Each structure stands twice: as C-alpha cells, then as structure tokens.
Amino acid sequence: MSNYYYYYGGGRYDWLKTVEPTNFLKIGLPYQAHPLHLQHQATTTPPSILEKFKRADILLNEVKAEMDPLMLQPETEKKLYQILGSIDMFKGLRKKVEFTYNAQIVTNAWLKMYELLNTMNFNNTSQAFCNCELPGGFISAINHFNYTMMHYPTFNWVASSLYPSSETDALEDHYGLYQCNPDNWLMQSPLLKKNVDYNDGDVTIASNVKNLALRATQRLTPIHLYTADGGINVGHDYNKQEELNLKLHFGQALTGLLSLSKGGNMILKHYTLNHAFTLSLICVFSHFFEELYITKPTSSRPTNSETYIVGKNRLRLFTPKEEQILLKRLEFFNDTPLVDLSLYQNLLESIYFAVETIHLKQQIEFLNFGMKCYRHFYNKIKLLNEYLAPKKKIFQDRWRVLNKLYVLEKKHKLKLCAPQGSVA
C-alpha cells in the first residue's frame, strides 16, 4: 500500500486520515503443467470447493446493498455519484495527460492500459489485436507506450467492437478512430448483413468469434498482444455483474486464445471472480501462459469490482479438439465449469487470495469510505473536494512518475476524425 495518507489536521474529519490511495495489485497464479481436460457436459462441483467464493460474494454484495436505496431516487443517486467522483484519486488526471504528453483518447481505459503495460513489463507491443475496443482508449494507450517507451519503429493494430447502433448498448465511435481507420477494424456495418461472412463484432456468437480470430490473423501476424475490455451495462444490478457478463467474457477470451500467437501476451477485463464458470475459465488460461496474474491497476476505481487478468508468454496453441469443445460451449452456452475444479486446488487458493485482496479488503474499504463521505458531505461536496485536492495532486504526480510518461511525437499520433457532436 502507498505511504501517502490523507492528512487534514485535527477535528471532526480526522477519519479521512484512515483511508490511503491504492497501489497496483498483482497476484500471480501457478502454471498448470498437467494435461487440460475440458468437460463436454455439465458435472457437479463439490460445494466445499466453491463455499468460500460464495461467502465472498455475499459479503461484498451486503456492502454494495447499502447503496441500493440511494439508486432509487434521482437526487440521492446523483449525490452518491458526485461523492464517489470526489474520492476518485484520478479525477482530473486525464486532461493533464492529454495536454502534457500529447496523448489521444485519454479515457479511464487509457490510464488503466498504460499502467498495465508499464507495470507488467511486456516484451513486445508492436502488433496488437484490441477487442471490445470502442471508443479506442486501449489502442491509443498502446500506441503511446509503443513509441515513447518501447521505441518500435511501427505500431500495427487491428480491432473489433460490437458495431455501434441505436439498437444496442455498444460504445460509440466518439473520437472517429473507426471512421478514419476502417481497414484496421474487423467488424462490419449492419448495412452489409447480406454478406455471407457478415460480422457485427458480437463475441457472444460463436461463429463471430471464430471469424474474428480468422480475420485478425489474416491481417496481422504475429499478434504479440491481445486485449479485451468488454462489459455489459447491468444498470443498478451490480450484484449480478459477474453472472450477467459470463458469456461475453468467455467470448472475448476465446477470441484471444484463437488469435494470439505463441509468445504473445493477453489482457482481459473481468469483474468479481467468484462464479464457478469464471474460476474454470481462469483454470483454462493457466495451461496456456508461462505467467498468469489477476491485477487491479491503481487507475481502476477501487469502489468498483473491475479486475484484469494478464497472461504473459503464451506457450502453446489450441488443439483442434480444444477449439471445437470451447466453440461449441459458447454456441450452446451454459455456466457450468469448463474443467473439473477439484483438480485445481492450489490455483483456486491463489485466486481466492486475489478475491480477498482486491474485493474483500480494498473494494469494501473504499465502499464504506464512500458511504461515510456520503453521510458527512451530502450537502458539502465542495468542502470534500477541497480536503482531498492536495493529496489528489500528490498521488497523480506520483502516478505520472511511476508510469514513465513521455511526450508522443506528432508523427506517431493515431489518425482521428471525430464525427460531429462527439466528445473529442
């Protein structure tokens, strides 16, 4: 944990001193050398294996539930989000990064990806496939890192996302990255539905996943880095966030495992890690990467459940049988485990340590802190911001130093053409 605390002298707000900003959390998982046996059909998992994960889910949801009544009224919901925004240590950092370092599309996703790249020490970032990618924060961060830190002469990329339309919750092309770089994108407009190989980027569809992986490898070989930042909007139902995203997260992972080259690295977004299917998916990953980690960047808000699974140095590709089984499971999806979890006791212990560290300790601590701030600063948000401003500056300056930011030369900037009415 960081040595930087909130200090505001004595008085009624001394309790603000008790919360400290987070450090990058990284929990290593053991490689599994034994053969991978994928389950063709559902089998019963002994309850004892999942018991503590279920308890962890209950404990976290009990804390989250304190906020549920506030979500029911527009006024209290607005105040809650204002408070949570005030305790976000990275609020305001995006503009500083954009203007100081000539960076592009500096979203929260940009900060997280840059931090992941800098902390995880990847050996190659020059050729990347970024999935579930719009509006483009990951690509922009990789581009910036590639040229300013890795000093490669080129950055080659392909990307995909659920095609933005009024009929879906897909993120839009706010910055014109898709509009100005159509040849880099793998998904297609609904206007092309008549095409035999039409693909709208929906990774919950097995045929799309297989097709996206094929397109990616045809356009870019080798693929050194695969990223996926998919997440379904669950409204206010955060207690079911992991469950509602199971199929999406399986699809984005499968796309990566079908396309990532040997020796490549992978970064996948997840939320809580308590569901038996999620645990089994991590078990599958452990057969393919020399190093596997569950991470929580400091720029990922500590009040949310977001995690990133990182695989380093892919050791082998799928066998035809493994590919067939996993694609069939996605096509006829059910959430039973992909493997026999009883064979992975040591790995599950490491995963639980990550759950305990990220969710049961850090997230619960910050959720409780957020609720306490809500009670004390409901009508004094300006005062809360004044209290936190000095330490935000210290922490943001520290983050910029730790993550070694440098100015991106103009010649290396991505081509953007933000459409009318965008947020660029």
UniProtKB/Swiss-Prot annotation:
Residue positions of the active site: 269
Pfam families: FtsJ
All residue ranges annotated as the Adrift-type SAM-dependent 2'-O-MTase domain in the record: 104-316
SUPFAM superfamilies, per database record: S-adenosyl-L-methionine-dependent methyltransferases (SSF53335)
Record bears the keyword S-adenosyl-L-methionine: yes
GO biological process terms held by the UniProt record: 7-methylguanosine mRNA capping; methylation
Membrane spanning stretches: none
EC number: 2.1.1.-
InterPro entries reported in the protein's UniProt record: Adrift-typ_MeTrfase (IPR025807), mRNA_Cap_2O-Ribose_MeTrfase (IPR050851), RNA_MeTrfase_FtsJ_dom (IPR002877), SAM-dependent_MTases_sf (IPR029063)
Example of a GO MF term: mRNA (nucleoside-2'-O-)-methyltransferase activity
Compartments where found: Virion
A single Gene Ontology CC term: virion component
Induction note: Expressed in the early phase of the viral replicative cycle.
UniProt keywords, alphabetically: Early protein, Methyltransferase, S-adenosyl-L-methionine, Transferase, Virion
Annotated binding of S-adenosyl-L-methionine, by residue: 136, 229
Name listed for the protein in its UniProt record: Probable methyltransferase EP424R
